[in-house]
Amino acid sequence: GFLGPLLKLAAKGVAKVIPHLIPSRQQ
C-alpha cells in the first residue's frame, strides 16, 4: 500500500523538524 512510504516520509519530516523546535537537545 501507500501508507507505509507515507509514514516513513512523515517520520523523516518529524525527525528533521524536532531538533529545530528543541535546539537544547542538540547541544
Swiss-Prot record:
GO terms for cellular component: extracellular region. Its main location: secreted. Expressed by the skin glands. The keyword Cell membrane does not apply. GO terms for biological process: defense response to fungus; defense response to Gram-negative bacterium; defense response to Gram-positive bacterium; hemolysis in another organism. Keywords: Amphibian defense peptide, Antibiotic, Antimicrobial, Cytolysis, Fungicide, Hemolysis, Secreted. It is found in: Secreted. Has very weak antimicrobial activity against Gram-positive bacterium S.aureus and Gram-negative bacterium E.coli and stronger activity against yeast C.albicans. Enhances the antibacterial activity of XT3. Has hemolytic activity against human red blood cells. This is Antimicrobial peptide 1.
